[in-house]
């Protein structure tokens, strides 16, 4: 709850790194608290990353594992003046937030919340997000670190801790020093419901269609003017209405999603995000988009257009399939915590995906964070306690199997 009160929102419009200096306010506190635990090498680097090591206490040669969470919170809702509230022994009904009583966390709209009857639920007060994404993960790693440092009877290998900035703007591991991190395998603590274990995520590309029209004075434009704006609108309108969009897909279905249109009569840009669990399907989606573009363009004499595709990230399953023990050990740790593992796929990206392709195979483990990026955000304290237990058991599992 202390961490939640520190404003650490990242800024998607910033070109600095980290995108906001205030993220370091929490990072500096984490370094101080890690050092107070006896983790003497805890440090904050110039880019806003926290690195720390829990030393091994076993003679076995155990792979070095890393636990990672991000300190920044989303810019989708205010993160200033967060006032966390504990709703003790939640009664299973709606939660009305006191600072804005129009903000109600409905048990009907949030069935997972309804299943947490009897738990202690943390929310914000109604005017901000909570920031459990991912301060729940940060707190869980810190609690587990404190436990391991004070319980030498729990045997484990060297454990690396990594706290990152700017995950919410897609730049979370952009400047991670992998040599300094020096870990063999990793786990992001950034998942949702109790027991969830995510070892697969979307593969992602970005695409930009640039339409070039012909400008003319509106008063004498007949048979001359060709509007790039209108052509761009036709391209977007030609996308399927009942498929291939975020609002019409779920489970393992991919999509083509226009996220920005900007321009003039002479030149208009349309930005798309293209997603699918199968990397090979991205090319098919991009070919489909090109056909739409060409078909629309053929109706407008003199107009031109280009399509540029940029790789964004890939499905971490492509890496993790070669290291099955990483996910298997996590599932075993979750079971030891008394929870049934729920294997899930992420309809989005994760720092773990990028880390996996940077040489650190890295699935995602639950934290309890729910209703992310909103004033309705909540987390169960009991779920968080189970996440802490999972981290501790996971350290033990790796040592036992070494």
Model-derived segments and their meaning:
Residues 1-21, 123, 215, 313, ...:
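N-terminal capping segment at the start of a domain
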Residues 21, 128-139, 222-230, 378-385:
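Short, conserved micro-motifs enriched in small and acidic residues
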């Amino acid at each position: 709850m202390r961490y939640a009160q520190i404003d650490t929102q990242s800024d998607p419009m910033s070109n600095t790194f980290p995108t906001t200096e205030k993220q370091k306010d929490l990072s500096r506190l984490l370094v101080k608290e890690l050092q107070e635990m006896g983790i003497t090498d805890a440090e904050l680097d110039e880019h806003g990353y926290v690195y720390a090591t829990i030393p091994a206490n076993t003679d076995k040669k155990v792979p070095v594992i890393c636990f990672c969470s991000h300190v920044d919170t989303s810019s989708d809702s205010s993160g200033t003046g967060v006032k966390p509230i504990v709703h003790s022994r939640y009664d299973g009904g709606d939660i009305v937030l006191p600072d804005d009583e129009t903000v109600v966390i409905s048990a009907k709209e949030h069935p997972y919340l309804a299943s947490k009857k009897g738990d202690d639920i943390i929310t914000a007060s109604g005017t901000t997000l909570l920031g459990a994404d991912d301060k729940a993960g940060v707190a869980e790693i810190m609690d587990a670190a404190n436990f391991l440092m004070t319980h030498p009877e729990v045997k484990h290998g060297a454990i690396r801790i990594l706290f990152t900035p700017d995950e919410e703007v897609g730049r979370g591991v952009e400047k991670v020093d992998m040599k300094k991190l020096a870990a063999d395998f990793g786990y992001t603590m950034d998942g949702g419901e109790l027991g969830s274990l995510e070892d697969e995520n979307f593969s992602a590309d970005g695409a930009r269609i640039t339409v070039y029209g012909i400008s003319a004075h509106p008063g004498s434009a007949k048979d001359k003017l060709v509007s790039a704006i209108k052509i761009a609108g036709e391209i977007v309108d030609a996308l399927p209405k009942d498929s291939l969009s975020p609002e019409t897909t779920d489970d393992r279905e991919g999509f083509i999603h226009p996220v920005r249109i900007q321009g003039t009569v002479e030149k208009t840009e349309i930005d798309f995000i293209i997603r699918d669990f199968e990397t090979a399907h991205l090319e098919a989606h991009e070919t489909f988009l090109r056909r739409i573009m060409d078909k629309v363009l053929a109706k407008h004499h003199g107009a031109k257009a280009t399509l540029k595709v940029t790789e964004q990230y890939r499905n971490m399953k492509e890496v993790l399939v070669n290291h099955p023990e990483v996910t298997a050990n996590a599932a075993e740790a979750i079971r030891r915590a008394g929870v049934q593992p729920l294997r899930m796929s992420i309809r989005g990206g994760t720092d773990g995906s990028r880390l996996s392709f940077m040489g650190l195979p890295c699935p995602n483990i639950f934290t309890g964070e729910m209703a992310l990026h909103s004033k309705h955000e909540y987390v169960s304290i009991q779920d968080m306690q189970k996440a802490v237990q999972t981290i501790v058991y996971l350290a033990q599992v790796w040592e036992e199997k070494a």
